[in-house]
Amino acid sequence: MRLILLGAPGAGKGTQATFICQKYGIPQISTGDMLRAAVKAGTPLGVEAKKIMDAGALVSDDLIINLVKERIAQPDCAKGFLFDGFPRTIPQADAMKAAGVKIDYVLEIDVPFEAIIERMSGRRSHTASGRTYHVKYNPPKVEGKDDVTGEPLIQREDDKEETVRKRLEVYSAQTRPLVEYYSSWAKTSPQAAPKYRAISGMGGVDEITERAFQALSS
């Protein structure tokens, strides 16, 4: 099972990725983890990436594709892999296609933006313990206070509505076009293209997992 998982920030990709990887016995690969591992291992590509990152520049798509090819050749990818947050742009998807990286499925978890904003901007956390709440779906017993210590809860910068909206704008401009890219590729050349599946990311975690498993067996 060689899989790309697509979806906006806050669509629940991370949660579903864990379940999918467990079911199929495959590793979850993100470009961030991959870069860190290559830098730590001191591979030639890792050394090159470190120089670029230390200079505050962005790692090129070519280098990332080479890292991807190196990563998926490792023994833990024998049964496949799940790409989370990669490819992020059309040029990356084109580069992956040109490099002959084979993908079986592209799975999109679709959640309306307004639902994501409500989901993320309603999160509250207790910094010391890591406990998290949601003003609507999992409220604390006393508004704004941690259930155990009674200490005040905070809203993380990442969860503020303005930040969430900005991240969704970036996603719309850069990554959302991949949905069209993979769905139209699947329609025009079904033999060569990965199977494209979209599921709703609304509802309970178990329901969404069930939808994901059904989509990946069809």
UniProtKB/Swiss-Prot annotation:
Q: Does the keyword Cytoplasm apply?
A: yes
What pathway or pathways are given for this protein in its record?
Answer: Purine metabolism; AMP biosynthesis via salvage pathway; AMP from ADP: step 1/1
Residue ranges, annotated region (LID): 122-159
Q: Which Gene3D superfamilies match?
A: P-loop containing nucleotide triphosphate hydrolases
Give the location in the cell. Cytoplasm
Q: Which GO terms describe its molecular function?
A: adenylate kinase activity; ATP binding
Which residues does the record give as ATP binding sites? G10, A11, G12, K13, G14, T15, R123, T132, Y133, G203
Q: Where is this region: NMP?
A: 30-59
Q: Record keywords: Oxidoreductase included?
A: no
What reaction does this catalyse?
Answer: AMP + ATP = 2 ADP
Could you give one GO CC term from the UniProt record? cytoplasm
Q: What EC number(s) does its UniProt record assign?
A: 2.7.4.3
A biological process (GO) of this protein is: AMP salvage
Q: Which UniProt keywords apply?
A: ATP-binding, Cytoplasm, Kinase, Nucleotide biosynthesis, Nucleotide-binding, Transferase
- Residues given in the record as AMP binding sites: T31, R36, A57, L58, V59, G85, F86, P87, R88, Q92, R156, R167
| Pfam families referenced in this protein's UniProt entry, alphabetically | ADK, ADK_lid
Q: What class of enzyme is it?
A: transferase
Q: Which InterPro entries match?
A: Adenyl_kin_sub (IPR006259), Adenylat/UMP-CMP_kin (IPR000850), Adenylat_kinase_CS (IPR033690), Adenylate_kinase_lid-dom (IPR007862), P-loop_NTPase (IPR027417)
Q: Hey, which family's this protein in?
A: Belongs to the adenylate kinase family.
Function (record text):
Catalyzes the reversible transfer of the terminal phosphate group between ATP and AMP. Plays an important role in cellular energy homeostasis and in adenine nucleotide metabolism.
Q: What is known of its domains?
A: Consists of three domains, a large central CORE domain and two small peripheral domains, NMPbind and LID, which undergo movements during catalysis. The LID domain closes over the site of phosphoryl transfer upon ATP binding. Assembling and dissambling the active center during each catalytic cycle provides an effective means to prevent ATP hydrolysis.
Q: Which HAMAP family match?
A: Adenylate_kinase_Adk (MF_00235)
Its quaternary organisation is: Monomer.
| Protein known as | Adenylate kinase
